[in-house]
């Protein structure tokens, strides 16, 4: 059963309104805390009860194809949504936890800036970003709360798309398969080529690679230089 984790640190207003009074429940989740490369993404979603979406679940248990299908449905049917991120530089400066909080804060603020203001924000996990709305953390919320499930899907798909773009620029690293996580393939590429500017220098395997080899910055001659797909956060029209 979903519950508020009252003992966890709360960074926002944690006085949740009565459930019956909530008209616009905003689900928030992040994607990409663990990888060695790429931004950390977050999404905020307010679902439309008049336009239900079947199949919403924690993005981690869905196939890539199913996530893509649901991504399009969420963007089309949700009352409002916003995707944001924190950069690799922000991750290295703030640490991954605080960068994740920043990405989630940006997602909620972006949604509210569109004119779709939440009555209550529910965040997956045991910590909340600082936002000017009632907010609560829901442990395993991505599996328990449909709006959080939707947010997890948007964040995951958006981040995976950016890592596939990064693969076009640095195919040696295999970003299209591991999307930045520390797989044996990725660690082997770090050992052979060193780290790129898109790697998180504050993460131990990247620090170790930089201690052995200079930064790998050259673009592959055969790859087209493509701008990242998520340089600007996006919000649904009302």
UniProtKB/Swiss-Prot annotation:
A divalent metal cation binds at residues 29-30, 124. This is Ribonuclease HII. It comes from Cupriavidus necator (strain ATCC 17699 / DSM 428 / KCTC 22496 / NCIMB 10442 / H16 / Stanier 337) (Ralstonia eutropha). Keywords: Cytoplasm, Endonuclease, Hydrolase, Manganese, Metal-binding, Nuclease. Its cofactor is Mn(2+); Mg(2+). HAMAP family: RNase_HII_B. One of its GO terms (cellular component) is cytoplasm. Residues 23-215 form the RNase H type-2 domain. The keyword Metal-binding applies. It is an enzyme of class 3 (hydrolase). Signal peptide: none annotated. Endonuclease that specifically degrades the RNA of RNA-DNA hybrids. It catalyses: Endonucleolytic cleavage to 5'-phosphomonoester. InterPro entries: RNase_HII, RNase_HII/HIII, RNase_HII/HIII_dom, RNaseH-like_sf, RNaseH_sf. It is found in: Cytoplasm. Its EC number is 3.1.26.4. Belongs to the RNase HII family. Manganese or magnesium. Binds 1 divalent metal ion per monomer in the absence of substrate. May bind a second metal ion after substrate binding. PROSITE patterns: RNASE_H_2. It holds the Pfam family RNase_HII. Gene3D superfamilies: Ribonuclease H-like superfamily/Ribonuclease H (3.30.420.10). GO terms for biological process: DNA replication, removal of RNA primer; mismatch repair. GO terms for molecular function: manganese ion binding; RNA binding; RNA-DNA hybrid ribonuclease activity. It comes from the Bacteria.
């Amino acid at each position: 059963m979903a519950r508020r984790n009252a003992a966890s640190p709360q960074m926002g207003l944690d006085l949740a309104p009565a459930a019956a009074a909530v008209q616009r429940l905003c689900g928030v989740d992040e994607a990409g805390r663990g990888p060695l490369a790429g931004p950390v993404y977050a999404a905020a979603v307010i679902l439309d009860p008049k336009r239900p979406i079947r199949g919403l679940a924690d993005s981690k248990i869905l196939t890539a194809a199913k996530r893509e299908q649901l991504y399009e449905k969420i963007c089309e049917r949700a009352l409002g949504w916003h995707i944001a991120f924190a950069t690799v530089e922000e991750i290295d400066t703030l640490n991954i936890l605080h960068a994740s909080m920043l990405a989630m804060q940006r997602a909620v603020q972006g949604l509210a800036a569109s004119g779709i203001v939440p009555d209550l924000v529910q965040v997956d996990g045991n910590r909340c970003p600082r936002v000017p709305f009632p907010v609560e953390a829901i442990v395993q919320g991505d599996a328990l709360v449909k709006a959080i499930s939707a947010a997890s899907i948007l964040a995951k798909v958006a981040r995976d798309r950016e890592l596939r773009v990064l693969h076009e620029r640095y195919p040696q690293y295999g970003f299209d398969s591991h999307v930045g996580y520390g797989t044996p393939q990725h660690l082997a590429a770090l050992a052979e080529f060193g780290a790129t500017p898109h790697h998180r220098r504050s993460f131990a395997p990247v620090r170790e690679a930089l201690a052995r080899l200079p930064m790998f910055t050259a673009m592959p001659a055969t790859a087209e230089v493509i701008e990242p797909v998520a340089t600007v956060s996006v919000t649904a029209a009302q």
